């Protein structure tokens, strides 16, 4: 089974893809859109995924606080998921995204990527971290 991971932000959507059989994730792209305009975002996501020749499931990063309570952005992501489910028939898996942006940023720093370039890459790399973490998590069948 193939998977498409999404890191949802108020202005960007980081996307990673991966193969559950081999448990390998890859950063794919970033969609930029007007703040909170998830309809615009989904239209662009449809264009990006239209060329995929395989069935896939979505893995959506869900932000939570350290104590597992809802964060300030949880509601925004929940609203995005509602729209996604209304526009796609694909299964949606919700996965904890705690620290993914921090991990992604550290990966870029460790690879000596300059700050300006890090900003361009952080969202798709965060989606990659979400998907690779999902693949590495034995609680989820692939």
From Swiss-Prot:
It is an enzyme of class 3 (hydrolase). Keywords: Cytoplasm, Hydrolase, Nuclease, Ribosome biogenesis. Gene3D superfamilies: YqgF/RNase H-like domain. It is found in: Cytoplasm. Its EC number is 3.1.-.-. GO terms for molecular function: nuclease activity. Signal peptide: none annotated. InterPro entries: RNaseH-like_sf, YqgF, YqgF/RNaseH-like_dom, YqgF/RNaseH-like_dom_sf. The keyword Nuclease applies. It holds the Pfam family RuvX. SMART domains: YqgFc. GO terms for biological process: rRNA 5'-end processing. Its main location: cytoplasm. GO terms for cellular component: cytosol. Belongs to the YqgF nuclease family. Could be a nuclease involved in processing of the 5'-end of pre-16S rRNA. PANTHER family: POLYNUCLEOTIDYL TRANSFERASE, RIBONUCLEASE H-LIKE SUPERFAMILY PROTEIN. This is Putative pre-16S rRNA nuclease.
